Curated annotation (Swiss-Prot):
Origin species: Xenopus laevis
Entry-linked InterPro entries: Dynein_IC (IPR050687), WD40/YVTN_repeat-like_dom_sf (IPR015943), WD40_repeat_dom_sf (IPR036322), WD40_rpt (IPR001680)
GO cellular component: dynein axonemal particle; microtubule; outer dynein arm
Subunit structure: Consists of at least two heavy chains and a number of intermediate and light chains. Interacts with DNAAF2. Interacts with DNAAF6/PIH1D3. Interacts with HEATR2; probably involved in outer arm dynein assembly. Interacts with C16ORF71/DAAP1.
Keywords for this protein: Cell projection, Cilium, Cilium biogenesis/degradation, Cytoplasm, Cytoskeleton, Dynein, Microtubule, Motor protein, Repeat, WD repeat
GO biological process per UniProt: cilium movement; outer dynein arm assembly
Family: Belongs to the dynein intermediate chain family.
Domain of life where this protein originates: Eukaryota
Region entry Disordered, spans: 519-542, 562-587
Signal peptide: none
UniProt protein name: Dynein axonemal intermediate chain 2
Length: 587
């Protein structure tokens, strides 16, 4: 900003006017050099010199305009029909064809064109141009390629108060959209003015969500209907179930009644393969599995309490954190619990207690993910604590394969839909690991630092090419894997089957060996001890009391030992002092 100040004065106060004129140069002083002064010159050594050695930097600011992107589509239908004929109506098209075939002009035109096309038709009938002559010598694709992944897009929570991206779901038709559920799962730490909205994103437009879903409570899980891509089902933090129809906007079409809903957050909701395509079931940490029909959400159609004692006691039920359902096995489903136990269930059992078939125990913490192998449904993948494990339905005591224990907690995992030996895991340090058991089993084939924030979930596209990861701050990262990680290799399915069968057989042998050792120990033990082994008399309270008793006894013994050492040490010091005094007196 320029500042101007005007000075005003009378002309008479300026003084006399200056008169300037040209004249030649004049020399006023000429000082000649003194040679005697040169003898007094002393060179300074060392000499301190200050210099500034740095890059020249300047600040630049650019205000760029943001491009608004829109999606446009064209609905192309079968052409060549009159306006009054609907190509979708079979009867109208058949009637029109018969009418045209009776026309004399049509017959002459077809006869003329037939002579031209006859030669080509005979060639097609004689030669199969699609025959593969070198089927067996087909080169393997992607084997020599180094595993890699590139970030395609990043979708950020548009709200000021960031929330965790708790669940991801791909659009079933074309996989061009991604539904993301946002919530805060930390108990009683949700911000006061936190937004409840979740979003549907177009993977090519990261600036603005395509549709905003407005539930009554934050969504913990969200799933597309595989039969109707316009319908989504969501599980809320307050235990309610709601469904949306994208053609009707972002408000839920209907929600369950709170009295008949879950009492805890709904961590998983899955669509069932039914004729109507309207049935689903949900799991929550309140220990209940509820079946629903979205045509009538007033109350659940079925209920299962996850009480492994089969007494249907809700107080003893195991909290469900993850759940799995394979459409090829319509009567079976599996549940991962907070206690690190896997519960295998049969939906078509006659009574609720019979629905719990068996349990698998192998994790030290909650099982955040459970998924069957898409190629071998008998094998399933689980993630809990610091490791990922691969199980077989035939081995209940232990898993057949597992990863090493990581330094960071694992949060989610999923199988590759195109390769039977590839699965992906996410960790709380923001790392995405891609495991390829076909080539390496000790370490991941690719470990990628996606974010500085914890990654909480992962979801792969149906073709295995793209994978999306959700973080704690609501950032969803879309990545493209290298071709070798999603291209099925030659003979890979047979090799994977042999590997799973080999590991299953090994675990069965170990289980049989352990069983024999336990029987031998029981046979050597006394009858009273044998009964004790079969039916332990001590309950959990007695075990805790005995442990506390042993602990305090050890503490008291240690204190007594230290006290005796101090007494002995003081006695030795006293004796040494007396000896030294006697020596002094003697001297």
């Amino acid at each position: 900003m320029e500042i101007v100040y005007v000075y005003t004065r009378k002309r008479s106060e300026f003084g006399r006017q200056c008169n300037f004129s040209d004249r030649p140069a004049e020399l006023h002083v000429d000082i000649l050099p003194d040679p005697s002064q040169a003898l007094n010159f002393i060179e300074r050594n060392p000499c301190d010199v200050a210099i500034q050695c740095s890059h020249d930097m300047s600040e630049h600011e650019v205000n760029t305009e943001r491009y608004d992107m829109e999606a446009h589509g064209i609905n192309h239908v079968e052409g060549g029909w009159p306006k009054d004929i609907n190509p979708q109506e079979m009867e109208q098209t058949i009637r029109f064809r018969k009418k045209v075939e009776k026309d004399d002009h049509y017959v002459t035109t077809i006869s003329q064109l037939g002579s031209v096309m006859e030669h080509c038709i005979k060639q097609n009938n004689a030669i199969n141009i699609y025959e593969e002559y070198f089927e067996e010598t087909e080169e393997l694709e992607g084997i020599d390629e180094t595993p890699s992944a590139n970030t395609v897009n990043v979708f950020r929570d548009p709200n000021e108060i960031k929330r965790t991206a708790t669940h991801l779901s791909w659009h079933p038709d074309g996989n061009r959209k991604l539904a993301v559920a946002y919530s805060c799962l930390e108990f009683q730490r949700a911000p006061k003015d936190m937004n409840f909205e979740s979003y549907i994103w177009d993977i090519e437009i990261p600036n603005k969500p395509e549709l905003t879903l407005r539930p009554a409570s934050p969504l913990v899980c969200l799933e597309y209907n595989p039969k109707d891509s316009h319908v989504l089902i969501g599980g809320c933090y307050n235990g309610q179930i709601a469904y949306w129809d994208t053609r009707k906007g972002g408000n839920p079409v209907e929600s369950t009644v709170i009295e008949y809903s879950h009492r805890d957050p709904v961590y998983k909701v899955i669509w069932l393969q039914s004729k109507t395509g309207t049935e689903c079931f949900s799991a929550s940490t309140d220990g209940q599995i509820l079946w629903w029909d979205i045509r009538k959400l007033s109350e659940p159609t079925e209920k299962l309490i996850l009480d492994i004692s089969k007494k249907e006691n809700i107080d003893n039920a195991l909290g469900a954190v993850s759940m799995e359902f394979e459409p090829t096995l319509p009567t079976k489903f599996m549940v991962g619990t907070e206690q690190g136990m896997i519960v295998s269930c049969n939906r078509k059992a006659k009574t609720p207690p019979e629905k719990i078939v068996c349990t698998y125990g192998g994790h030290h913490g909650p099982i955040y993910s459970i998924q069957r192998n898409p190629f071998f449904p008998k094998n399933f993948l689980t993630v809990g604590d610091w490791t990922a494990r691969i199980w077989s339905e035939d081995c209940r005591e232990s898993s057949i394969m597992w990863t090493k224990y990581h330094t960071s907690y694992l949060t989610d995992a999923c199988w590759s839909p195109t390769r039977p030996t590839v699965f992906l895991t996410t960790k709380i340090d923001g790392t995405l690991d891609v495991w390829d058991y076909m080539y390496k089993q000790n370490n991941p084939s690719l470990s990628l630092k996606v974010s500085d924030e914890p990654l909480y979930n992962i979801c792969m596209q149906d073709n295995g090419r793209f994978v999306a990861c959700g973080s704690k701050m609501g950032v969803t990262t879309l990545m493209e894997l290298s071709k070798g990680l999603y291209t099925l290799q030659r003979n890979e399915r047979n090799l994977a089957s042999a590997m799973f069968e080999r590991e299953t057989k090994r675990e069965k042998i170990l289980e049989a060996r352990h069983r024999e050792m336990r029987l031998k120990e029981r046979s050597k033990a006394e009858p009273g001890e044998e009964v004790k082994d079969e039916k332990p008399a001590e309950d959990m309270k007695e075990i805790i009391a005995n442990a506390e008793k042993d602990f305090f006894e050890n503490i008291e013994a240690e204190l007594k030992r230290k006290e005796q050492q101090e007494i002995k040490q003081s006695e030795d010091e006293h004796q040494e002092k007396e000896v030294s005094e006697e020596k002094i007196v003697h001297e």
